[in-house]
Protein backbone atom coordinates (compact mmCIF):
# COMPACT_ATOMS: atom_id res chain seq x y z
CA UNK A 1 0.00 0.00 0.00
CA UNK A 2 1.40 3.44 -0.90
CA UNK A 3 2.47 5.90 1.77
CA UNK A 4 1.59 9.58 1.34
CA UNK A 5 3.44 12.49 2.88
CA UNK A 6 2.13 15.44 0.90
CA UNK A 7 0.84 18.95 1.52
CA UNK A 8 -1.74 20.57 -0.73
CA UNK A 9 -1.28 24.31 -1.31
CA UNK A 10 -3.75 26.81 -2.72
CA UNK A 11 -1.46 29.76 -3.44
CA UNK A 12 -3.15 33.14 -3.73
CA UNK A 13 -1.91 36.71 -3.72
CA UNK A 14 -3.01 37.33 -0.12
CA UNK A 15 -3.26 33.88 1.44
CA UNK A 16 -2.03 30.30 1.08
CA UNK A 17 -4.45 27.54 1.99
CA UNK A 18 -2.72 24.43 3.36
CA UNK A 19 -4.13 20.90 3.51
CA UNK A 20 -2.74 17.56 4.62
CA UNK A 21 -3.71 13.93 4.40
CA UNK A 22 -3.27 10.84 6.50
CA UNK A 23 -0.40 8.53 5.55
CA UNK A 24 -2.73 6.15 3.71
CA UNK A 25 -4.18 8.98 1.61
CA UNK A 26 -7.71 8.23 2.75
CA UNK A 27 -8.67 11.47 4.49
CA UNK A 28 -7.76 15.03 3.57
CA UNK A 29 -8.29 18.05 5.79
CA UNK A 30 -7.59 21.74 5.61
CA UNK A 31 -4.86 22.54 8.11
CA UNK A 32 -4.37 26.29 8.13
CA UNK A 33 -4.38 29.46 6.10
CA UNK A 34 -1.17 31.45 5.88
CA UNK A 35 -1.58 35.20 5.48
CA UNK A 36 1.13 36.21 3.06
CA UNK A 37 3.62 38.91 3.99
CA UNK A 38 6.85 38.13 2.16
CA UNK A 39 8.58 35.09 0.69
CA UNK A 40 10.71 34.39 3.77
CA UNK A 41 7.62 34.38 6.01
CA UNK A 42 5.75 32.11 3.58
CA UNK A 43 8.68 29.67 3.53
CA UNK A 44 9.02 29.68 7.32
CA UNK A 45 5.33 28.93 7.84
CA UNK A 46 5.19 26.16 5.22
CA UNK A 47 8.52 24.73 6.40
CA UNK A 48 7.25 24.38 9.98
CA UNK A 49 4.17 22.46 8.80
CA UNK A 50 6.20 20.33 6.38
CA UNK A 51 8.69 19.34 9.08
CA UNK A 52 5.99 18.57 11.65
CA UNK A 53 4.14 16.35 9.16
CA UNK A 54 7.32 14.86 7.61
CA UNK A 55 6.21 15.99 4.16
CA UNK A 56 7.98 14.63 1.09
CA UNK A 57 5.98 16.38 -1.67
CA UNK A 58 4.18 19.69 -2.22
CA UNK A 59 1.02 19.48 -4.35
CA UNK A 60 0.34 22.95 -5.69
CA UNK A 61 -2.83 24.11 -7.39
CA UNK A 62 -2.12 25.75 -10.73
CA UNK A 63 -4.84 28.20 -11.79
CA UNK A 64 -5.16 27.52 -15.50
CA UNK A 65 -7.40 29.82 -17.51
CA UNK A 66 -10.73 28.32 -18.58
CA UNK A 67 -9.27 27.76 -22.08
CA UNK A 68 -6.46 25.67 -20.57
CA UNK A 69 -3.72 28.26 -21.01
CA UNK A 70 -1.39 29.56 -18.31
CA UNK A 71 -2.34 33.10 -17.39
CA UNK A 72 -0.39 35.59 -15.29
CA UNK A 73 -1.62 34.15 -11.96
CA UNK A 74 -0.55 30.63 -12.99
CA UNK A 75 2.89 31.90 -14.00
CA UNK A 76 3.26 33.72 -10.66
CA UNK A 77 2.26 30.51 -8.88
CA UNK A 78 4.87 28.54 -10.83
CA UNK A 79 7.60 31.06 -9.96
CA UNK A 80 6.62 30.92 -6.28
CA UNK A 81 6.46 27.11 -6.32
CA UNK A 82 9.90 26.80 -7.92
CA UNK A 83 11.44 29.09 -5.31
CA UNK A 84 9.59 27.28 -2.51
CA UNK A 85 10.77 23.89 -3.77
CA UNK A 86 14.38 25.07 -3.73
CA UNK A 87 14.06 26.70 -0.31
CA UNK A 88 12.49 23.61 1.29
CA UNK A 89 14.39 21.02 -0.75
CA UNK A 90 11.09 19.33 -1.59
CA UNK A 91 9.74 18.23 -4.97
CA UNK A 92 6.56 19.79 -6.31
CA UNK A 93 3.78 18.64 -8.54
CA UNK A 94 0.95 20.70 -9.99
CA UNK A 95 -2.77 20.01 -10.08
CA UNK A 96 -5.26 21.89 -12.27
CA UNK A 97 -7.14 23.97 -9.71
CA UNK A 98 -9.71 25.56 -11.99
CA UNK A 99 -12.87 26.26 -9.99
CA UNK A 100 -11.59 24.81 -6.69
CA UNK A 101 -12.18 28.11 -4.86
CA UNK A 102 -15.69 28.28 -6.32
CA UNK A 103 -16.34 24.67 -5.30
CA UNK A 104 -14.94 25.35 -1.82
CA UNK A 105 -17.20 28.38 -1.45
CA UNK A 106 -20.24 26.32 -2.48
CA UNK A 107 -19.33 23.64 0.08
CA UNK A 108 -19.10 26.26 2.83
CA UNK A 109 -22.51 27.65 1.82
CA UNK A 110 -23.95 24.12 1.91
CA UNK A 111 -22.70 23.84 5.49
CA UNK A 112 -24.78 26.91 6.34
CA UNK A 113 -21.75 29.15 6.82
CA UNK A 114 -20.95 32.47 5.19
CA UNK A 115 -17.90 32.28 2.91
CA UNK A 116 -17.50 36.06 2.95
CA UNK A 117 -16.86 35.98 6.71
CA UNK A 118 -13.96 33.54 6.54
CA UNK A 119 -11.93 33.72 3.34
CA UNK A 120 -9.32 31.52 5.01
CA UNK A 121 -11.86 28.68 5.17
CA UNK A 122 -12.24 28.87 1.38
CA UNK A 123 -8.45 28.70 0.96
CA UNK A 124 -8.13 25.68 3.28
CA UNK A 125 -10.99 23.86 1.57
CA UNK A 126 -9.56 24.67 -1.87
CA UNK A 127 -6.18 23.27 -0.74
CA UNK A 128 -7.97 20.13 0.46
CA UNK A 129 -9.69 19.77 -2.93
CA UNK A 130 -6.32 20.17 -4.68
CA UNK A 131 -4.72 17.48 -2.52
CA UNK A 132 -7.74 15.17 -2.90
CA UNK A 133 -7.58 15.54 -6.68
CA UNK A 134 -3.90 14.55 -6.64
CA UNK A 135 -4.59 11.55 -4.40
CA UNK A 136 -7.40 10.44 -6.71
CA UNK A 137 -5.03 10.70 -9.68
CA UNK A 138 -2.51 8.49 -7.85
CA UNK A 139 -5.13 5.77 -7.54
CA UNK A 140 -5.85 5.79 -11.29
CA UNK A 141 -3.83 3.53 -13.58
CA UNK A 142 -0.28 4.91 -13.71
CA UNK A 143 0.13 8.09 -15.74
CA UNK A 144 3.33 10.03 -15.60
CA UNK A 145 2.60 13.58 -14.43
CA UNK A 146 4.47 16.83 -14.17
CA UNK A 147 6.41 16.24 -10.97
CA UNK A 148 9.49 18.40 -10.86
CA UNK A 149 12.08 19.61 -8.42
From Swiss-Prot:
Transmembrane segments: none
Keyword Nuclease attributed: yes
Protein localization: Cytoplasm
Cellular component GO terms, alphabetical: cytosol
Family, per entry: Belongs to the YqgF nuclease family.
Species of provenance: Synechococcus elongatus (strain ATCC 33912 / PCC 7942 / FACHB-805) (Anacystis nidulans R2)
EC numbers for this chain: 3.1.-.-
Name of the protein in its database record: Putative pre-16S rRNA nuclease
An example Gene Ontology molecular-function term: nuclease activity
SMART domains reported in the protein's UniProt record: YqgFc (SM00732)
GO biological process: rRNA 5'-end processing
Broad class of where this protein is predominantly found: cytoplasm
InterPro entries: RNaseH-like_sf (IPR012337), YqgF (IPR005227), YqgF/RNaseH-like_dom (IPR006641), YqgF/RNaseH-like_dom_sf (IPR037027)
Keywords: Cytoplasm, Hydrolase, Nuclease, Ribosome biogenesis
Biological role stated in the UniProt entry: Could be a nuclease involved in processing of the 5'-end of pre-16S rRNA.
Keyword match rRNA processing: no
Amino acid sequence: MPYYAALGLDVGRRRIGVAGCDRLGITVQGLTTIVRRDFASDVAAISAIAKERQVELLVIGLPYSMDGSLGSQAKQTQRFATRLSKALQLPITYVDERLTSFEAEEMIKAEGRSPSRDKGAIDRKAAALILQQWLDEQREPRRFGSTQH
